[in-house]
From Swiss-Prot:
Annotated gene: rpiA
Cystine pairs: none
A Pfam family that the UniProt record links to this protein: Rib_5-P_isom_A
SUPFAM superfamilies xrefs: D-ribose-5-phosphate isomerase (RpiA), lid domain, NagB/RpiA/CoA transferase-like
Family designation: Belongs to the ribose 5-phosphate isomerase family.
Protein name: Ribose-5-phosphate isomerase A
Binding-site residues for substrate, renumbered to this chain: 30-33, 87-90, 100-103, 127
Residue positions of the active site: 109 (proton acceptor)
Molecular function GO terms recorded: ribose-5-phosphate isomerase activity
UniProt organism field: Prochlorococcus marinus (strain MIT 9303)
Keywords: Isomerase
């Protein structure tokens, strides 16, 4: 039997797929929960429950998985719009601001989320926090030749930034865009995500950071009640 966290992820993945309609262009996110959603989508396409779906992936890993499941794919530059994007998150605060980028895919993830008419985030209950960056580091993608300079500038903003090192190869993590990632801890967490997102992105050498501000329309939260996995729906108030 799957552990409780996996059960929560499976529940929200299934709930997210229920929002998909025939003919949609979908943003297919990255990470473990999004992977379960892609698997569930593939099963519905194979059974004929869904038809004429086109996916836009946010990572090479997601592209490989979707292709193996027979999900038709297009590049982001080949679509005029995205009806619905579904993705996971590393942290979600009460204002629906996110930290993403644990898998170093946040640049493409943010491009897809910002293009979508609706952006739905799927997480288990462990990802809901009162304040961002107290438990998860903020990823910042930087040009390879600029990481030392950016590291120093982030320190001026009150952050401690470490170069992310790879687990299965020697040297640092290299993103799909060929860049490096700094993982940042801000003293006391992030109180104003919108301001910090702008400040970091204005630093020379920074491509993008993992703060997703004012993009999320709905959060589906997997939770366990009386030993049974269920889903809580949180919708942003305009």
């Amino acid at each position: 039997m799957a552990d409780l966290q996996t059960q929560m992820k499976q529940a929200v993945a299934a709930a997210a797929v229920e929002q998909i309609k025939d003919g949609m262009v979908l943003g297919l996110g990255s990470g473990s929960t999004a992977a379960l959603m892609i698997q569930a989508l593939g099963a519905k396409l194979a059974s004929g429950e869904l038809r004429e779906i086109v996916g836009v992936t946010t990572s090479f890993q997601g592209e490989v998985m979707a292709a193996e499941l027979g999900i038709p794919l297009r590049n982001l530059t080949a679509v005029d719009r995205i009806d619905l994007a579904i993705d996971g998150a590393d942290e979600v605060d009460p204002s629906f601001q996110l930290i993403k980028g644990g898998g170093a895919c946040h640049v493409q993830e943010k491009l897809v989320a910002s293009r979508a008419d609706r952006f739905v985030v799927v997480v288990d209950s462990t990802k809901i926090v009162d304040r961002l960056n107290l438990g998860f580091l903020l990823p910042v993608e930087v040009l390879p030749g600029a990481w030392r300079q950016v590291q120093g500038r982030l320190a001026e903003l009150g952050g401690i930034a470490d170069l992310r090192m790879a687990q299965c190869k020697a040297g640092p993590v290299v993103t799909d865009q060929g860049n490096l990632v700094l993982d940042v801890s801000m003293a006391g967490g992030i109180g104003d995500p919108e301001d910090l997102e702008c400040r970091i992105n204005n630093l020379p050498g920074v491509l993008e950071n993992g703060l997703f501000v004012n993009l999320t329309d709905e959060v589906l939260v997997g939770q366990i009640s009386d030993g049974v996995a269920g889903v809580r729906r949180l919708q942003r108030r305009e």
